[in-house]
Amino acid sequence: GPDYDDVGAMAVMHALADSGYVDILATISSNKSELTIPCIEIINTYFKRPDISLGVAKGESAVTLECPHNKKWTEVLPQKYTHRIAKSSDAPDAVKVYRSILCTQPDNSVTICTIGAFSNLKELLQSKGDEFSPETGVELVRRKVKQLVSMAGVFPEGREYNIYCDASSSSFVVSHWPTDIIFCGFEIGYNIITGRRVSRMPVENHPIKDVFLLCMSQGEPQGRWSWDQATVWVAIKGYTPYYISERGVISVDSEGNNTWRTTR
C-alpha cells in the first residue's frame, strides 16, 4: 500500500497460485504504516491462505505511507474483515522472515517480487549470520534467489516513486544485488488500466472488489494503472509473450533518478 494497485497485485498473485503457477512463501511489506499488515492478512485469508508468513519493514530508512483518499481503503478493510494482527508493528521483522524462509528453500529457486521500496532488501543484503543461517545476506541471496523482479524505475531514464522514496536503499540494492533483476518500469503498467470489471463483479464481501469500488468512486471511474499487477505477472509467468526485454545496467543517484545502459 497505499496505492490500490497493490491490492490488484495480490489478487493476481493469489489467482496464479490457485492455478498452480506459484507457491507463495511470504508476503512482506516495505511500508511501515500500521494498517498495511492487517490489510495483507485480510487478503491472504480471503484467498484461503491465512498462514502465509508476514513481515514488515523495521529499518530506519523504511517509509511510512498512508492512503491519499478521503475515505481510505486501508481503514475500511480492517474495520470490515477480521484479522489476527492488530497493527503492522506487531508483525515479524521483514529481514528475519526473508532469512528464515530463504535458508529452507532449494538453491536458485526463489523469485523475490517487489512492488514498493527497496528498504527491506537493503537490510537483507546487509544482514549478518543468525539463528537461521551463518551466511551473510548477500551470500544467502546469491545461493537461494533465482531472480528479483521489481516495479521500479522509468526507462531508459527518469525518476520513479519506488526508487526515490528511499533513494539510498535503491542505489545500494541495484549496486549490490547478486542475481539478475528484472525491472518493470513505470511505462509498463501505465498503459494497462484495471478495475472496471472487478468493481462490477456480482459478489458481496469481496475485499478486492471493495477496494476498487471505493477508490474508483473517489475520482478514477475508469480504473487504475496497473504497475504492480504487471510486475507480479512477470515475476510468476515471465515477460513473454507480452513484453520484450533487454540486458543492461541500471544506475540510481542520490536523488532517486535512474539511468539505463544497454549491454550485450
Question: Which residue ranges define each predicted feature?
Answer:
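N-terminal acidic, glycine/proline-rich low-complexity segments
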Residues: 1-264
